[in-house]
């Protein structure tokens, strides 16, 4: 068994055959654009700021996405070597920018693990904590350190990637490497709105186990809805169609959009456990 999840065996014959018909992730990606009500999200964030609690757009999107995945667990499946696996955890990878003292901007990739006992506040706190620990020039996470070491030895990167790819293909890649890799994730998300850029449909990587890539774009007038006085945030989503059926994807997106329409549903632990204490929410002014 792979360290990141067991193989799914109780599949209909056609579903089990699809990964052999489309063996590569780039063969199997579909894309969709969802428009999120920017006015409603901003109003929700402002409401909690008045209560002294800090939230941001990416935390809102991730929380709604994860809550919908708990209702539709097949969205956390992945395909490797022609087989479908059920991931035994949920994590999100994303990129942040780090500005050096000479003005050059570098990127680093972070990964956050979520639990069913999380709510929108604990998810926001986890994201802020991992960003705070990695946003400065002198800070390096384990992924950065490993990459820096790998590229310090001529010829090593090509061999390491080749070895990791083949070990992963046969379920032999160690859990420690999977934890280091941003490409082994339930969802990869990028927030292009933060740099005032339009959304794109970003491919899912062939290396690793990413089945869904979400890209947040800068808000635009609601042309589709016909109300140009309101803004929506377009989200480009690319998904691996092999992990579930179109009907199951549709059910997921219905739930996802439902949580975004009523964000108050994300304020209590997703598994119904005891709500967190008020002091565990991220207060305004704390990054």
Where are these regions (language model features)?
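C-terminal catalytic/motor cores of large multi-domain enzyme assemblies
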Residues: 1-287
